[in-house]
């Protein structure tokens, strides 16, 4: 009877080890609804299921000085204090930016990882994620910047990696195409700390990529919210819509218990045999 109980315990430990060896998150939206999102500022979900980050008037035209943010409703564990392990993640989304005929684009949108409970920051070129202070925002973002701001931007429209600042640590020029759907793929590999973001216009077969190493554990809290932030220009001549059409996200964080659990299971089995 004792051997039987020990064998059952060993098998349980093996199963428990595999069940708890990683924390994983996955979700996918082809249509959005408010139930699965935290909406801030002017962000809303349209009747057709699009995530509209910034405001439009009754004629569907973008408005000046709009700011909106939207995050997945559940927090994501991006690293583990006990083990020191960091998650890898992969996200895909499609967005569309439309600029009226009588205006220029401004200011852009960003995919962001922010502290849980984070509130919108400054409008305009700060994209709702940062402000002019020297605060530690505990924020990592990939920005799709449509307007040059002389205080921190390169001179061209660009895709940038932002770490605690609106001044990107790495940028690549971006040939923005008005009204065209853009498909974005962003990956983070924890073993190399490499963050890679690629944008493709499928209809034009053009692509743009930016990458750099980012130590998420040194920047972000253990638990974050993932989602989007966008702003329109603060003057009438520079406005745009900022719509997310679809979004998927997957992350995996190893909890470091696999080897410990197997060692304990082996110890129990050795006592039986």
From Swiss-Prot:
Glycosylation, residue list: 33, 92
InterPro entries hit by this protein: ConA-like_dom_sf (IPR013320), L-lectin (IPR016363), Lectin_LegA_CS (IPR000985), Lectin_legB_Mn/Ca_BS (IPR019825), Legume_lectin_dom (IPR001220), Leguminous_Lectin (IPR050258)
Keyword Glycoprotein: yes
Matches recorded under SUPFAM superfamilies: Concanavalin A-like lectins/glucanases
Pfam family, one: Lectin_legB
KW NADP (keyword) present: no
Sorted UniProt keywords: Glycoprotein, Lectin, Signal
Gene3D superfamilies: 2.60.120.200
GO MF annotation terms: carbohydrate binding
Residues of the signal peptide: 1-21
Family per record: Belongs to the leguminous lectin family.
Protein name in the entry: Leucoagglutinating phytohemagglutinin
Organism, scientific name: Phaseolus vulgaris
């Amino acid at each position: 009877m004792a051997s039987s109980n020990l064998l059952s315990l060993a098998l349980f430990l093996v199963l428990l080890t595999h069940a708890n060896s990683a924390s994983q998150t996955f979700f996918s939206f082809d249509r959005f609804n408010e139930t699965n999102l935290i909406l801030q500022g002017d962000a809303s979900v349209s009747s057709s299921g699009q995530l509209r980050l910034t405001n439009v008037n009754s004629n569907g035209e973008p408005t000046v000085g709009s700011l909106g943010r939207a995050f997945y409703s559940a927090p994501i564990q991006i690293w583990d204090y006990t083990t020191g392990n960091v998650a890898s993640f992969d996200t895909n989304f499609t967005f569309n930016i439309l600029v009226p005929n009588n205006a220029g684009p401004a200011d852009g949108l960003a995919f962001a990882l922010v502290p849980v409970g984070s509130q919108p920051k400054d409008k305009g070129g700060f994209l709702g994620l940062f402000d002019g202070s020297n605060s530690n925002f505990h924020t990592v973002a990939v920005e799709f910047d449509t307007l040059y701001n002389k205080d921190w931007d390169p001179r061209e429209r660009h895709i940038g990696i932002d770490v605690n600042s609106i001044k990107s640590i790495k940028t690549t020029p971006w040939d923005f195409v008005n009204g065209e759907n853009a498909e974005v793929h962003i990956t983070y590999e924890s073993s190399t700390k490499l963050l890679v973001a690629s944008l493709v216009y499928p209809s034009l077969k053009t692509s743009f990529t930016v990458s750099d190493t980012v130590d998420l554990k040194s920047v972000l809290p253990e638990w974050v919210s993932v989602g989007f932030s966008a702003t329109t220009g603060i003057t009438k001549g520079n406005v745009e819509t900022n719509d997310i059409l679809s979004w998927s996200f997957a992350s995996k964080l190893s909890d470091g218990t696999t080897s410990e659990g197997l060692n304990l299971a082996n110890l129990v089995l050795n006592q039986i045999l």
